[in-house]
């Protein structure tokens, strides 16, 4: 079957290709087509007729030439034969075109009336088409033509309903040999009514119609086709005749079987003309169908031509000399009737106006004959067409061009309508879940900011806040431990809460007896083991009193351990403020009060050392009341208990008050939940590795639990209590030493047992990355302002120091203490601080930076000591913080430039001058003030003007050399490198001494 591309057909019809694609489903083409796809010739014929173009006669019947008759065609012919009238004499009639069947729902189309029978005309010889001609359209709403009896020929291709046509008179050459025409279908409309329009459902093919056959007089030399059986016809009286068709060019067709003629038709076969294939064999008709189709029908009333409707193009008329054959469909804005002076089918002349629209420009698609008017908007098309359609896109682009340009104003973020809680290291997926949006929307917001992330990638807290703001949500940033604790607390049951032991922190000034008081309670001797008799570590202990446990935390009282005291106040339930009765309130006592008030915990004052003779407890109460702590016996709410750590006086009363205050607070915990606590202290043990002292505040800590502690992830390998006994479980308010950390945590970090190890490792990596970035930011390139500042501070000396301590808290305290010693003359710079013994890497670092190494309660390793001796590195070891700070101060003083001071000795007056050979000028002088030492320096004053400064060459009394001449004595003085001495000059003796620089004035 011949095919044609949609692009070529669109250019031929002068329409857009997408309009043809939208029309294909209505013609029964359900396949997916594109602009470059091909369609069958029969579909192309329907499209040509739909758009009002003449169908060339050289387009042959594809079903009759290239393909055998299909089963569907056979059924259609059987259906047509079932509606044919009874057999009648065949007669040659004028050629006609197929008619569009009336809708099945139209009642007028179903009424059938018998038509008068006419004698059949003899069959004319069949000729091939010789010339193209316009299709001749039947009246609107006409019924299908009846079919004669006999064998069926190849079916004609289905065509859509053509446009109406003006009837013409029959040609005078009708008597010449011509092609037999099909019988005229009987009119099937009620009288004085407009014929109903044929309505086709979208996506269904138009009803088939027969192909028109031209009946024109053959020209000389024209080759005619073979004989063809005529069809019985019952023309309606007064029906308009069809015009003659233009001869078509010859075309090779496949031989067809000849239909047997009906009654009255000539039975003798016609002789085939030259070039015509042999006729098909004749098949006798079925008697039952002949009898059925030969039944008489009711006559049909003559039909008047329908008046043209607005918006519907009228049927194409015959060509007129001097006018174009194709006049095209009526376009938008074109009048239905041509104006005077305007040629039909041509655009009107517009002098000075714009050019007419291009023929292929987008126009309105006109419906076919009998079809309802199309909707206002182009809603046609196959189901599943992509939207928006091309027309909508073009219309939108035109509107953008035509309407005035407006300044683009970016819409601000939506108003805040909710608040979410985000933790550090939140991922894109977790943020989308909290915002209740899809993750791809969050990723799109990040891509708009130029940030490309994966769905499981962590986000910075500031960036997550900005993204949440774009979705109309405010954020509250909390740590991972706090968020995990909140989720656990929300899920826990109040019935699981049990009473826990109180945590008591002992605070006070140094040497006020804090550790001694705790030793008396624990019946131990911890203070005796402390270096210098002072506490330099924070410790936690558990004491049992009357079947109940009390946890004590001992904090240092030295001024350098402020952060330790602050850390102890944050994890405590009760603060015991120890004040010596013989010393009174001291600066660290006031600091401890401030820490306790900041932590909002109750305070119990223990007035210690009441066994001494000079103890004044009442004076202590007065001083504390001036600071806002009013005793109970004075009408206040602060419990004050006089105690003595040495004689254990008042200790039972102190413990009783601790339990009473704890009962008032109603301290409870849930032992069945995952454990959480606080790191009190951390140290690096040589045999056990990193060890952390943890106070469990809630839950139960067991061996084998995974935990996160700041930027450290680990697993509990072993636990030891305060007495060094290994345990398997630690209940709430229990201090334990935990082994199994990957690295050393910071003192004060939160300790949290986790179940999601992957999430915990992700948080640890995030924190570690942040710490590295912070360290890198400190060592980044300096700015120009910083360079100028360093140039201005070029006179400031710097003392680099490396600190190694036994525990992390001590290293932290030492770093802060030494940095506070810096002033405008000498600056102490701590290059590195760590925990553990002094190793070889510390020595090499000190050698490279010309620093000194300070070890606090640690010793250097063997290879480190050898390296330090080889590299000449100064290593200082200390156990008491007092001695350490004093030595650093001396080192700072030694860095400054020496200061020399002039010390006056005495002066002598020149009374006479002598000149001796081999010696030079000698001045005879008398000492008038002080003394003149021989090794001192001197200056010569003449009229109170210094004329020379130098050293004394020789000092003699008479003929003897002397070391010193005192006041009132005479002597002879010679000066080195100076001989211009005169009578009356003053020789002043002085000495230069080096004076130590005062660093701390």
From Swiss-Prot:
Limits of the tr-type G domain: 499-668
Keyword terms: Cytoplasm, GTP-binding, Initiation factor, Nucleotide-binding, Protein biosynthesis
Database matches in Gene3D superfamilies: 1.10.10.2480, P-loop containing nucleotide triphosphate hydrolases, Translation factors, Translation initiation factor IF- 2, domain 3
Stretch list, region G2: 533-537
Region annotation G1: where it falls in the sequence: 508-515
SUPFAM superfamilies: Initiation factor IF2/eIF5b, domain 3, P-loop containing nucleoside triphosphate hydrolases, Translation proteins
Annotated segments matching region Disordered: 56-418
Pro residues bias: start-end ranges: 136-170, 180-194, 204-217, 229-252, 305-322, 345-357
Region of interest called G4, as start-end residue ranges on this chain: 608-611
Protein localization: Cytoplasm
Region (G5): 644-646
A single MF term (Gene Ontology): translation initiation factor activity
Region (G3): 554-557
InterPro entries linked to this entry: EF-G-like_DII, IF2_II, IF2_N, P-loop_NTPase, Small_GTP-bd, T_Tr_GTP-bd_dom, TF_IF2_bacterial-like, TIF_IF2
UniProt-annotated binding residues for GTP: 508-515, 554-558, 608-611
Presence of the UniProt keyword Cell membrane in the record: no
Biased composition (Basic and acidic residues): 70-84, 109-120, 379-410
Role played: One of the essential components for the initiation of protein synthesis. Protects formylmethionyl-tRNA from spontaneous hydrolysis and promotes its binding to the 30S ribosomal subunits. Also involved in the hydrolysis of GTP during the formation of the 70S ribosomal complex.
Similarity remark: Belongs to the TRAFAC class translation factor GTPase superfamily. Classic translation factor GTPase family. IF-2 subfamily.
Matches recorded under PANTHER family: TR-TYPE G DOMAIN-CONTAINING PROTEIN, TRANSLATION INITIATION FACTOR IF-2-RELATED
Name of the molecule in the record: Translation initiation factor IF-2
Native organism taxonomy: Bacteria, Pseudomonadati, Acidobacteriota, Terriglobia, Bryobacterales
